[in-house]
């Protein structure tokens, strides 16, 4: 009973510190929380939690504040992600429903997430490696060169030069393009490469075998491209309100390292909990500039029938934990949404906002409104 009560005390300390950003003492815990024990007992529990590394006392006469270990315990035991209010959901739908392209939706999402959380928001566009083929066109541009224009399911347009020994007739190139579009629609780029090689080996395509092989090579090259096309960031001005000004310079440096940031948040979005979000705290990120920060990330992507948000409320919250797990497991992440803030951020609210925006973008992709 003593240990379980101590964990209740820890939870209360974390909640109060997140709210006030001031060291928390036993007197305020006794007054504000129904812990069922005296102030002296709570004081002993807090001392024990400090010995165990969950709390720290910044000054002898001050109360306690959570450590990374304390925040991690708190986050891992959040029973549920607090659902957004109906007004918040309506606001998200209203603001994002005006998006006319995926790029527009991603830019709007970054701005909105930053406004909701009061923190830095980062939204990545999908990489080619996670995309599926929607359409390809091949256009001769020189005696031995074609330009392959590849359009993916996320609306991304990629161009790739194809070098061949000799140029076939335009009609033969168009026939190959039509066959590739028929057989590769909806396939990943790596699967598309395999299919194109099979087409090249089949009867009737001898004259365009060199073109097909070059196109397959291009698909394979694109399939290895894990980089996000764009990284949209909003809300760096919120950092100016930080109480720890000494932490700002390394944090700004970390935000400038977009490759490191993308890798961190992409990995985190793939290591989500049952609520569909991942959280990294301080030194867990192994990035000096983020030592005093936390990151919340969630993937967005393709959704199957069971996971698609229904009706006119794509950010509508699931009613049960099993529904949340179903939606999470039924979505194949192809990019991420994230929020970066102080370690004393409101984790429950931030996790809810990140998840809601990720679910909206998943619905947006499912509707196919991705063309610029």
Swiss-Prot record:
One of its GO terms (molecular function) is DNA binding. The keyword Heme does not apply. HAMAP family: HrcA. It holds the Pfam family HrcA. This is Heat-inducible transcription repressor HrcA. One of its GO terms (biological process) is negative regulation of DNA-templated transcription. Residues 300-334 are annotated as: Disordered. Belongs to the HrcA family. The gene is hrcA. Keywords: Repressor, Stress response, Transcription, Transcription regulation. Negative regulator of class I heat shock genes (grpE-dnaK-dnaJ and groELS operons). Prevents heat-shock induction of these operons. The keyword Transcription regulation applies. InterPro entries: GAF-like_dom_sf, HrcA, HrcA_C, WH-like_DNA-bd_sf, WH_DNA-bd_sf, WHTH_transcript_rep_HrcA_IDD.
């Amino acid at each position: 009973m003593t240990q379980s009560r101590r964990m209740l005390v820890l939870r209360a300390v974390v909640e109060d510190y997140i709210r006030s950003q001031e060291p928390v003492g036993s007197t305020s815990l006794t007054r504000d929380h129904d812990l069922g024990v005296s102030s002296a007992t709570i004081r002993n529990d807090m001392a024990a939690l400090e010995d165990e590394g969950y709390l720290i006392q910044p000054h002898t006469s001050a109360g306690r504040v959570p450590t990374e270990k304390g925040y991690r315990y708190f986050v891992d035991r959040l029973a549920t992600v607090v659902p957004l209010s109906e007004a918040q959901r309506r606001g998200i739908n209203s603001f994002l429903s005006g998006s006319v392209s995926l790029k527009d939706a991603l830019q709007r999402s970054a701005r909105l997430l930053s406004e909701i959380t009061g923190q830095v928001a980062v939204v990545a566009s999908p990489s080619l490696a996670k995309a599926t083929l929607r359409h390809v066109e091949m256009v001769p541009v020189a005696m031995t060169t074609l330009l392959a224009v590849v359009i993916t399911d996320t609306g991304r347009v990629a161009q790739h030069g194809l070098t061949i020994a000799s140029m076939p007739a335009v009609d033969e190139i168009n026939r190959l393009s039509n066959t590739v579009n028929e057989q590769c629609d909806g396939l990943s780029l790596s699967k598309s490469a395999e299919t194109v090689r099979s087409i090249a080996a089949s009867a009737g395509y001898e004259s365009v075998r060199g073109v097909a092989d070059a196109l397959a090579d291009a698909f394979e090259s694109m399939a290895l491209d894990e980089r996000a096309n764009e990284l949209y960031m909003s809300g760096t001005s919120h950092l100016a309100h930080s109480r720890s000004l000494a932490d700002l310079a390394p944090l700004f440096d970390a935000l400038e390292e977009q490759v490191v940031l993308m890798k961190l948040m992409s990995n985190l979005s793939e290591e989500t909990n049952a609520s569909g979000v991942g959280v990294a705290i301080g030194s867990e990120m192994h990035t000096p500039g983020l030592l005093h920060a936390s990151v919340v990330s969630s993937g967005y992507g393709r959704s199957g029938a069971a996971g698609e948000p229904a009706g006119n409320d794509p950010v509508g919250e699931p009613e049960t934990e099993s529904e949340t797990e179903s939606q999470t497991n039924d979505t194949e992440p192809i990019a991420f949404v994230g929020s970066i803030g102080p370690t004393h951020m409101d984790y429950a609210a931030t996790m809810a906002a990140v998840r809601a925006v990720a679910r909206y973008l998943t619905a947006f992709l499912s509707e196919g409104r991705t063309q610029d």
